């Protein structure tokens, strides 16, 4: 703590000696990080292929969603593990009530406010909550890293901004820039080609392998972008905001939100906050009996996308092999009392 206080004092004295300075390091100075622009396009394209592949797989592999909580299950019959925490769960002994799931239940991404100018106006206030659009956080991260979308315009600078006594000042004149239009066309064209190549595949196993590859490609690319571009999450609720600062919209309803007047408690986000993995129970035998509540300590888990692709024929990834507990042999239901 003493070192942090000393560093803060030194930075304050440096600002007094040089009140007007040009920010040099992107993206803090309003410019893009050149080496991350192609990564952003790869992440965006991988997300489009992922959604296309999952939409095909859910037509063959059923997805079950609890009516009262966020529990998800991949399989023809929902599991019998009593973990429901939704309304009326006490009357049902925490048993889930299953309904048919959708694509966005498998690939869930929280929404984030879209920032037109991430440096000049990095924060959305409460009165602007109805006017500023909310888009998936992974898409907003790609836009801030260099992806240009016609539906969600953003300001691109060619000169760095200045900091005058801690305030960001932009001396660049506003002018129309049409350099991004060909890039939009190229992006749409490449995405269409990827979707067409995906649609031409009829083998379920090939679709599952391609879908899982796009999942890992999206995750790895997003991690690289998050090293430079800030992503914040609330410490009490799942709200996510992509940008250097968190928004001021009073919408938090988690623990002690009354003491914070509904404001979020922002902290640095991880990849799981940006792209929720949504862990589900791993089913070894899709044609067997439902997962038993008494045997839940013998079952493993995996992200919903991974479990869906594995049941469709994709090989089990090495990084999730131990989590799925493939080396554990669960006993039969009549052998529970005989196992230590």
Regions from the PLM with identified roles:
Residues 64-77, 231-245:
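Short Cys/His-rich zinc-binding micro-motifs
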Residues 1-56, 92-239, 245-340:
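Cys/His-rich zinc-coordinating modules
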Residues 39-42, 54-68, 84:
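Core mature regions of organelle-targeted
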């Amino acid at each position: 703590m003493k070192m942090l206080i000393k560093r803060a004092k030194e930075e304050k004295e440096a600002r007094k000696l040089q009140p007007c300075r040009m920010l040099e390091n992107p993206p803090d100075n309003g410019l893009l990080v050149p080496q991350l622009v192609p990564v952003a396009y790869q992440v965006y394209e991988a997300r489009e292929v992922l959604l296309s592949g999952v939409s095909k797989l859910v037509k063959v592999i059923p997805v079950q969603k609890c009516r009262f909580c966020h529990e998800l299950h991949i399989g023809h019959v929902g599991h019998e593990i009593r973990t429901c925490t939704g309304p009326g769960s006490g009357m049902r002994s925490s048993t889930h009530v299953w309904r048919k799931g959708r694509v966005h239940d498998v690939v869930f991404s929280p929404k984030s406010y879209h920032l037109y100018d991430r440096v000049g106006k990095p924060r959305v206030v409460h009165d602007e909550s109805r006017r500023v659009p909310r888009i998936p956080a992974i898409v907003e991260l790609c836009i801030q890293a260099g992806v240009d979308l016609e539906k969600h315009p953003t300001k691109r600078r060619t000169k760095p901004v200045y900091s005058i006594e801690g305030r960001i000042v932009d001396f660049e004149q506003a002018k129309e820039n049409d350099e991004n239009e060909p890039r939009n066309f190229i992006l749409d064209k490449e995405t269409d080609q990827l979707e067409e190549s995906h649609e031409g595949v009829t083998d379920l196993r090939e679709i599952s392998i391609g879908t899982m590859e796009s999942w890992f490609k999206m995750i790895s690319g997003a991690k690289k972008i998050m090293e430079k571009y800030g992503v914040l999450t609330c410490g009490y609720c799942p709200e996510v905001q992509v940008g250097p600062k968190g928004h001021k919209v009073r919408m938090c309803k988690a623990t002690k939100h009354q003491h914070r007047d509904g404001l979020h408690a922002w902290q640095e986000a991880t990849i799981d906050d940006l792209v929720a993995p949504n862990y589900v129970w791993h089913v070894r035998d899709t044609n067997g009996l439902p997962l038993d509540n008494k045997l839940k300590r013998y079952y493993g888990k995996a992200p919903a996308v991974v479990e869906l692709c594995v049941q469709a024929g994709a090989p089990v990834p090495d990084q999730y092999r131990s989590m799925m507990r493939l080396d554990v042999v669960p006993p039969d239901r009549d052998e529970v009392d005989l196992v230590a």
